[in-house]
């Protein structure tokens, strides 16, 4: 109320996910990848009928219809500190958009503690920092496919010594504009 912002959704805590038959059935994650809580981040893929998955779909729908004038082309998820659910939120939101048949691109701009590549079992490099630091001028060479239809990912790339400067650069603004036009 203080900032006159509307509420688009509330995502409950995922908690522990049962691993026995569900993961074997989906064949999404093998035993090695389940360590470290990575498996539970993709709740919309692992357990699409759960209340948490429904909350992500509700959030997606509310975001789709929150602007009647113009289609939302990009979404930024941030928080004040680590471990607050940014990666889990963006991964599940991206899956819900892709499940609608929308061509979806998830860009990991957590340049300090990137995890998106682990969640989707992808190589971290090359990624967005390779583009921002001028190592490549073709962002399309960074786009990686994953197991989920309609979902592509640009991983973070190398961990730079100057993440704030890279994210605030003109090259980053140009990348966002290009991505909004192309995706």
Language model: regions and residue ranges:
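Nucleotide-state-sensitive switch-loop elements of NTP-binding domains
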Residues: 126, 132-159
């Amino acid at each position: 109320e203080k900032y006159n912002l509307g509420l688009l959704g509330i995502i409950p805590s995922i908690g522990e996910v049962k691993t026995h038959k569900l993961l074997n059935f989906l064949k999404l994650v093998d035993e090695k990848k389940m360590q470290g809580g990575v498996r539970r981040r993709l709740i919309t893929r692992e357990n699409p009928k759960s209340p948490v998955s429904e909350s992500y779909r509700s959030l997606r729908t509310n975001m789709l219809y929150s602007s009647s004038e113009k289609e939302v082309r990009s979404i930024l998820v941030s928080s004040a500190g680590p471990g607050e659910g940014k990666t889990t939120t963006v991964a599940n939101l991206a899956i819900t958009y892709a499940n609608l048949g929308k061509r979806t691109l998830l860009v990991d701009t957590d340049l300090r503690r990137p995890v998106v590549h682990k969640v989707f079992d992808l190589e971290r490099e090359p990624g967005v920092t390779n583009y921002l630091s001028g190592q490549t001028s073709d962002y399309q060479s960074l786009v990686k496919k994953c197991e989920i239809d309609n979902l592509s990912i640009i991983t973070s790339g190398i961990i730079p010594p100057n993440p704030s400067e890279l994210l605030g650069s003109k090259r980053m603004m140009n990348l966002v504009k290009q991505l909004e036009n192309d995706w």
